[in-house]
Amino acid sequence: MKNLNSNNTPTAEQLNNFFSTIGQSTHDKVQNTKCSPKEFLSKIPIKNSKSLFFRPITVDETRTYIRRMASKATQDIYEISSNLVKLVAEEIICPMTDIVNSILQQGVFPDKLKIAKVCPILKRGNPTDVDNYRPISILPTFSKIVEMAIAEQLISFLNKNNYMTDAQFGFRQNRSTMDAVRSLFNYIAEGFEEYFITSVQYCDLSKAFDCMTHSIFLDKVEHYGVRGVAHSLLSSYLSDRKQCVHHNNKISSTTSIRHGIPQGSILGPLFFIIYMNDLPANLNCHTVLYADDTTLAVRDRSMSPLQDETEIIISEAALWFQTNKLCLNKEKTKTLIFSSSRRDTFSGSATFLGITMDARLTWREQCMTLKHKLHGIVYAIRRIRHIVSPEAALMVYYGLFHSRMIYGLELWGGSCHVTEILISQKVAVRAIAGNDPRCHCRPLFVKYKILTVMAELAIKLATGVYKDKSLFSKRSDRIPYNIRTKEDLTLSRHRLDVTQRSNLALKLYNRLPLEWRNLSETKVRAKLRAHLVDVPIYSLEEFQINPG
């Protein structure tokens, strides 16, 4: 719907109509299949008949849930903010606990807690076009407390019974976007070592969170053991949800939401990863999920069978998406072929969770793309430096430049192209100081206590070993007699440069002082940061000469 209003912006009513029907309209585009979602669920066998029973929560748990809420002054439909709830927490904590326990016991989510206040935010472009607005949904503040109680017990039940797929990295404890990217990278790199060509499908789902079909979701959780009162509560939570739009000091009428998960909710992301949970079990490929971001990878030693396998995987995935009423955008779904052989002429790149991989894993595209973004930030620092202090410019640097610079560094930092990022960082530091472009940078890194990109890389790699140290063997395990390097971890052998980079972390760990190796990861990181702030390094070789 375009240009709904001749005035500057659409009305609250027009925006509400658009937001409330977008999930339905996308859902209706998906044609029915002869399959049932339950057929796909059969690939996840249930080894026991355990059911989820919500236990009553304690006053202390309610207090913890209130403390966990983000401190915000934003008011919900009832003009209640989380700041207000935190202010009066001790006065309401006992009755709130009773209310939550009543909901858990009866299996009914109150209708008053299912009304969302939606505030539209203009994303870009023409302000008269409703497509250019992003809905920001504000749920009743008290509903967050109930949701935390439900989510905690539901997650515990699923994890205890080992129902959640290892392929899902989104909205799960101790898992991150980098873990997801690393899973894909390792699969491709391991294939390189064994002379495999890898085909990766980057699937694009249209409005996935808005399209989740409630009845299909409820069948899925029932399969996992959410039955009886617990099942009724989840059904009650999703049904009869409503929203109204607040825009330009006007409030729209209230409309019903029949599809999708509530934006801004605690339970919504958890519900969605449960919805996607049986996809990997139905595909014979390496699957990496981060919520709705889906990559499917297959590999073979020759191109002809790889193409056949790729077509089969795409077809099977498309059937799963269609049967589960999710809209696969085939125009935006991308295929990229990875190969280490120079005889292959594959090219191109694709971005997954903010990290760009090229067909040979050289990381050139990632570094060049990042360099371009960082140059724009340096320009902004230069402009503001004329009117603010170096301390203020330093805050801008950390907020915009440094955070982008170190994202995914442990993956792409070992490439030769990382020097381009170091050059950009030097330019940024000179801009903070307001110095001449040709001035020496090491004193500036020390003065402002900024870690170089190579220092950040050394810290990430060396401390990263601590998480999986038990997986590596020591040299003393293989050599029976006493040697000086007996406490060093054994390096693995690799055929290619791209896979040999995995040894970088072990090499850096082996250079750490012996007395550090039994310390915690946190303490070692602190020691390295304290050392490398005073001794800026421009290469990993410098770190190996003087690690601490």
Regions of interest found by a model, annotated:
Residues 339, 445-491:
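A glycine-rich beta-turn/hairpin centered on an aromatic-Pro dipeptide
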Residues 1-131, 145, 164, 197, ...:
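Surface-exposed loop/turn segments and immediately adjacent short secondary-structure elements
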Residues 19, 48-262, 298, 395:
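Conserved pre-catalytic core of RNA-dependent polymerases
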Residues 76, 115-118, 134, 168, ...:
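Catalytic palm active-site di-aspartate
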Residues 349-410:
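Basic, alpha-helical interaction scaffolds
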Residues 52, 249, 312-315, 323-351:
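Short, conserved micro-motifs composed of acidic
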Residues 400-415, 456-469:
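Extended, well-ordered alpha-helical segments in internal regulatory regions
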